[in-house]
């Protein structure tokens, strides 16, 4: 356990041993890392704990410097624990290097079986072991995006461990399949494309120029991954953030150096497309929705139902660029099989990814009956235009969780917790406490 100071905070690094498979508590153990953050001058105070569950899946918690964003509001009332969910950050990593030997010795099936232990149900059981080690009392839980899904899993299977729950952009569909979810999200992504091109009509021509170039040339990113038209389309994953449309515009405003794509553009695309920071995001994205059925590469299959995402088809009826270009529709956070083939950090998992996609015995992630009887104070922010978590599914879930209060807002996008300077968290705290 190591402690150090940042401006206005004291941070303590903690490691916890947890079983890889919670059904076999005496079996293989892995390590989970968490960072405690407390306001300077409050290190010895008797403050309630707030567990932060990061969005993802597959990303470690934020690395704070000072008291930025929502953390400043949280530190007024809580001792915060930033959890690197299993397999991420400084927790025992699950990536191509750590799982290479497993694949070499036992094959892709063993890799796939190993990866089944990195979903929300296992994360919640990790959290319970950590809670019992740190404090005997229930703690508060803040879940952002995928972390909100974990929070609902927590309310389903270990509500005794939660004092109060705050969920931001992360109320999951309780019974919908991955197919159902992608049918909703493709429509939302299409609307985000339309809004982007209305804001930046010049980008119609720019995007089409890049797509036409890629259609006629073999292009490699700095990490060796191929940049194809579908890969370029996946740059639309940023459109769900507050500044996402502007970020996409800046990417498109100067992509060429003479007659070739510029190094700076290719580097920017690599940063957007590479899963080096979070390989589990790609491998477990669709399995994170699965309950009792196979996902079978749902995003790829359902995409065929939406012709506007075909690069050969105009996305907007009657809308053209300045030079007569047909709009190219960008995709969202969907994961496609070609991504596993293309990305060097994912390629070793190609067979394992297919095995995960065909697995049909996934255990439940939520307990509707338990949620209907919920007695944990809880509040959720539902973002009206959320591109990543469907609003209608979120509201169905909100109605299914007894006592859950919701705040539906168009003031923020999916990243409202991060960009609101504490306002989103402050409102949810006020709702739970009866002040709003």
Q: Which residues make up each language-model segment?
A:
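Gly/Pro-rich cap/lid or specificity-loop segments adjacent to the active site
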Residues: 2-30, 35-224, 338, 343-354, ...
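Charged, amphipathic alpha-helical interaction segments
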Residues: 39, 399-402
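Core-facing hydrophobic residues within beta-strands of well-ordered domains
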Residues: 162, 401-404
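Alpha/beta-hydrolase fold active-site neighborhood
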Residues: 218-359
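Short alpha-helix in the alpha/beta-hydrolase fold that links the catalytic acid
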Residues: 251-253, 390-399
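Short beta-strand/loop motif that positions the catalytic acidic residue
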Residues: 374-375, 379-382
């Amino acid at each position: 356990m190591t402690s150090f100071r940042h401006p206005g905070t004291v941070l303590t690094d903690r490691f916890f041993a947890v079983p890889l498979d919670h059904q076999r508590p005496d079996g293989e153990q892995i390590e989970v890392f968490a960072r405690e953050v407390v306001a300077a001058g409050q290190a010895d105070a008797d403050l309630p704990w707030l567990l932060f569950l990061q969005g993802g899946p597959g990303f470690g918690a934020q690395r704070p410097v000072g008291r930025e964003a929502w953390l400043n509001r949280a530190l007024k009332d809580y001792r915060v624990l930033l959890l690197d969910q299993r397999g991420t950050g400084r927790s025992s990593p699950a990536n191509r290097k750590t799982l290479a030997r497993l694949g070499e010795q036992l094959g892709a099936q063993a890799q796939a079986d190993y990866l089944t232990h990195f979903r929300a149900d296992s994360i919640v059981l990790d959290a319970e072991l950590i809670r019992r080690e740190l404090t005997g009392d229930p703690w508060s839980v803040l879940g952002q995006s995928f972390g909100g899904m974990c929070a609902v899993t927590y309310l389903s299977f270990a509500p005794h461990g939660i004092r109060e729950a705050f969920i931001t952009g992360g109320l999951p569909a309780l019974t919908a399949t991955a197919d159902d979810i992608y049918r909703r999200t493709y429509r939302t992504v299409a609307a985000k494309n339309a809004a982007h091109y209305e804001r930046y009509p010049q980008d119609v021509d720019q995007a089409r120029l890049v797509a036409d170039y890629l259609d006629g040339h073999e292009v490699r990113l700095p990490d060796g991954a191929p940049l194809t038209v579908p890969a370029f389309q996946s740059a639309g994953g940023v459109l769900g953030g507050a500044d996402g449309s502007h970020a996409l515009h800046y990417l498109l405003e100067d992509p060429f150096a003479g007659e070739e794509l510029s190094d700076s553009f290719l580097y920017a695309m690599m940063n957007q497309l590479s899963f080096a920071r979070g390989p589990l995001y790609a491998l477990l994205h669709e399995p994170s929705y699965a309950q009792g059925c196979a996902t079978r590469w749902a995003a790829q299959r359902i995409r065929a139902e939406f012709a506007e995402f075909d690069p050969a088809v105009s996305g907007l009826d009657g809308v053209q660029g300045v030079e007569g270009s047909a709009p190219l529709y960008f995709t969202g956070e969907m994961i496609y099989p070609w991504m596993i083939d293309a990305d060097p950090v994912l390629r070793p998992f190609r067979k394992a990814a297919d095995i995960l996609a065909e697995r049909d015995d996934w255990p439940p992630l939520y307990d509707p009956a338990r949620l209907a009887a919920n007695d944990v104070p809880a509040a959720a922010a539902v973002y009206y235009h959320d591109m990543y978590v469907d609003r209608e599914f979120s509201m169905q879930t909100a109605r299914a969780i007894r006592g859950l209060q919701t705040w539906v807002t168009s003031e923020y996008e999916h990243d409202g917790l991060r960009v609101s300077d504490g306002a989103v968290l402050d409102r949810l705290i006020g709702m739970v406490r009866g002040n709003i």
